[in-house]
């Protein structure tokens, strides 16, 4: 009975649990996988690197390449991927933009390459996030300036070399813009610099008062009036040099209109124009005052030094790039001058014998105070005037000091940019020099190739052309290997006989073999054997009359390789496989000899029916023969007095 109760009691309890109300509301449905319609995982293969993302992620930006139907042109049906032959590191930032909606600019990547990737995927640079936007614009601006400078240098002919068919104008403009291209350009560069210095010094010295000892009483007068002929001759010589330079620059300029509108062209005109106006101006007292005014413009000749000084050019570029900051400084100073001049005028208005008679008269005091000069010709006397004068001085220091760091940073940036440009030009010159050296090396190799008999003359008469001699592939590999050995061992290897002469100096037979064997035996200095042995083909057997080595063990196949030995200048020796000095060879011998290296390989038992078995002159007639075959492929062995090549 107890056993029966124990059996059905758990089922009763389970049923009772089902009767009790466990929750007041119905239970939620069982969790399941919700099928997402229209969303799938897309695989994007960028140069072998696979990226996976949702289709809806890319569809958020339908105006781009990945978000539009244009990406279907890059779909590979075999792999089921979208393949793009682009930079995978850049694509990581592009894909993050689709995921997060923020585009970041990588610092370690080239800004131009980044722009190209954005243009390919249809993204505009304005999508760059605020965290990277300022740095992106600075880098892009710097890169644009560098490219503009390179383009100007290329148009001006400031490159390392000019084309062979360059015109006279191009050569002249290159000489003016880059004086270090030739000796004549460098001489003209220093001559013009000398005359610029003479002109500036003469313009200063002619105003120095000089005493005239001939007049009684002595009277001081300017040196220009005392020695008019000397100063006129110096001025004439300088102006002639400047005029010739200006006309030559105008003739050689790539764009004459652009040259006439340039700042340096205007400086040249202003430097030489007063001379010609004074030369043709009538000597009349009524117009002498205007001529004296025109002579003031001669001081602008000093700006011609900017062509001869890289620092002055950098300073000009800096001021040009800081135009907005300088405009802000000028506007701020103008406002402060007007405000403090008005305050100082009303503060000093009630005093007797004051110098602040009007607001424009107070401008001078405000300018001198804000620039911290303080001449002392105008001084406030009231307490209010002194207080406002102190405030004016402090505000001037703050206003002037604000744009200074920006100007300094721009100067430093342009300076380092010019340094990098000079370094790139120097590296480009080095690369071009290496290319010319390589070309000259190729020419020398061609001449050596011809000297070694690899080229022959074809045709007759005066017109003879060089053509490559028809050689077997085996012989071509032989010459190629010799060339490689010369480069690696710094020794020169030469053949005693050409390939055709070596074949004509021996008698050939017929023999077939499956494998290659090598044996070398000493022969006369005037004979050399070589042949080419392809696989499973009939091979020529060479029987030597003066063979000194014989094979006594079974039927052996031997391939003899002979190579010419010449005296090596290197004192040290190098060994190689397949290279072995013969016992009877005198290493101190200066004459050429041939060395034998024997590698024996058992002959296969099966022979072709047409195989001939020549008897060895030194053997015992056991079916073995000394077969000599010369393979032109060789490996050098440099002995103390000889150089030996033995081939596989």
UniProtKB/Swiss-Prot annotation:
Instruction: Extract the ranges annotated as region (S4-S5 linker).
Output: 310-323
According to UniProt, the reaction catalysed is:
K(+)(in) = K(+)(out)
Q: Pfam families under this entry?
A: BTB_2, DUF3399, Ion_trans, Shal-type
Provide one Gene Ontology biological process annotation.
Answer: protein homooligomerization
Q: Where in the cell is it found?
A: Cell membrane
Q: Which residues are glycosylated?
A: 352, 355
List every stretch annotated Required for dendritic targeting: 474-489
Intramembrane region ranges (chain numbering): 360-371, 372-379
Highest taxon in the source lineage: Eukaryota
Q: Which InterPro entries match?
A: BTB/POZ_dom, Ion_trans_dom, K_chnl_volt-dep_Kv, K_chnl_volt-dep_Kv4, K_chnl_volt-dep_Kv4.1, K_chnl_volt-dep_Kv4_C, Shal-type_N, SKP1/BTB/POZ_sf
Q: What is its main location?
A: membrane
Q: Where does Zn(2+) bind?
A: 104, 131-132
What is the name listed in the Swiss-Prot or TrEMBL entry for this protein? A-type voltage-gated potassium channel KCND1
Which organism's genome codes for this protein?
Answer: Bos taurus
Recite the lineage of the species: Eukaryota, Metazoa, Chordata, Craniata, Vertebrata
């Amino acid at each position: 009975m107890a056993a029966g109760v124990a059996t059905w009691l758990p089922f009763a309890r389970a049923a009772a649990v089902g009767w009790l109300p466990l929750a007041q509301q119905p239970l939620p449905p069982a969790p399941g996988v919700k099928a997402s319609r229209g969303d799938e995982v897309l695989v994007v293969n960028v140069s072998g690197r696979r990226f996976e993302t949702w289709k809806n992620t890319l569809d958020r930006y339908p105006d781009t390449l990945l978000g539009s139907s244009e990406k279907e042109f890059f779909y590979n049906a075999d792999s089921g991927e979208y393949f793009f032959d682009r930079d995978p590191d850049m694509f990581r930032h592009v894909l993050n933009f689709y995921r997060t909606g923020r585009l970041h600019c990588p610092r370690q990547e080239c800004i131009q390459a980044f722009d190209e990737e954005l243009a390919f995927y249809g993204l505009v640079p304005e999508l760059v996030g605020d965290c990277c936007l300022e740095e992106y614009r600075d880098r892009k601006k710097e890169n644009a300036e560098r490219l503009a400078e390179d383009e100007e240098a290329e148009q001006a002919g400031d490159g390392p070399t000019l084309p062979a068919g360059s015109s006279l104008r191009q050569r002249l403009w290159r000489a003016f813009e880059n004086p270090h291209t030739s000796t004549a350009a460098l001489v003209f560069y220093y001559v013009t610099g000398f005359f610029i210095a003479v002109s500036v010094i003469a313009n200063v010295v002619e105003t120095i008062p000089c005493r005239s000892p001939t007049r009684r009483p002595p009277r001081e007068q300017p040196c220009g009036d005392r020695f008019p002929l000397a100063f006129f001759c110096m001025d004439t010589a300088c102006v002639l040099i400047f005029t010739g330079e200006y006309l030559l620059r105008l003739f050689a300029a790539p764009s004459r209109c652009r040259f006439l509108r340039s700042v340096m062209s205007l400086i040249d005109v202003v430097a030489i124009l007063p001379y010609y106006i004074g030369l043709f101006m009538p000597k009349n007292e009524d117009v002498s005052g205007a001529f004296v005014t025109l002579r003031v413009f001669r001081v602008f000749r000093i700006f011609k030094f900017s062509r001869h000084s890289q620092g002055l050019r950098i300073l000009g570029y800096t001021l040009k790039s800081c135009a907005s900051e300088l405009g802000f400084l000028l506007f701020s100073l103008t406002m402060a001058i007007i405000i403090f001049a008005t305050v100082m005028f009303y503060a000093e208005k009630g005093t007797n014998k004051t110098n602040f008679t009007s607001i424009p008269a107070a401008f001078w005091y405000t300018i001198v105070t804000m620039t911290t000069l303080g001449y002392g010709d105008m001084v406030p006397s009231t307490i209010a005037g002194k207080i406002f004068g102190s405030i004016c001085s402090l505000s001037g220091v703050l206003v002037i000091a604000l744009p200074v760091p920006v100007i300094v940073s721009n100067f430093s940036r342009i300076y380092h940019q010019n340094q990098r440009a000079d370094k790139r030009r120097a590296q480009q010159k080095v690369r071009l020099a290496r290319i010319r050296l390589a070309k000259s090396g190729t020419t020398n190799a061609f001449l050596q190739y011809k000297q070694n008999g690899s080229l022959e003359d074809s045709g007759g008469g005066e017109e003879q052309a060089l053509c490559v001699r028809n050689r077997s592939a085996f012989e071509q590999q032989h010459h190629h290997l010799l060339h490689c050995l010369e480069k690696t061992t710094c020794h020169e290897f030469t053949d005693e006989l050409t390939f055709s002469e070596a074949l004509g100096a021996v008698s050939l037979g017929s023999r077939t073999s499956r494998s290659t064997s090598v044996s070398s035996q000493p022969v006369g200095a005037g004979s050399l054997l070589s042949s080419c042995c392809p696989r499973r083909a009939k091979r020529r057997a060479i029987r030597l009359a003066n063979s000194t080595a014989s094979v006594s063990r079974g039927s052996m196949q031997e391939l003899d390789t002979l190579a010419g030995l010449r005296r090596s200048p290197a004192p040290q020796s190098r060994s190689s496989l397949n290279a072995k000095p013969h016992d009877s060879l005198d290493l101190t011998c200066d004459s050429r000899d041939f060395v034998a290296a024997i590698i024996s390989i058992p002959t296969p038992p099966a022979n072709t029916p047409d195989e001939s078995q020549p008897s060895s002159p030194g053997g015992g007639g056991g079916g073995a023969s000394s077969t000599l075959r010369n393979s032109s492929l060789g490996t050098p062995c440099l002995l103390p007095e000889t150089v030996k090549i033995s081939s596989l």
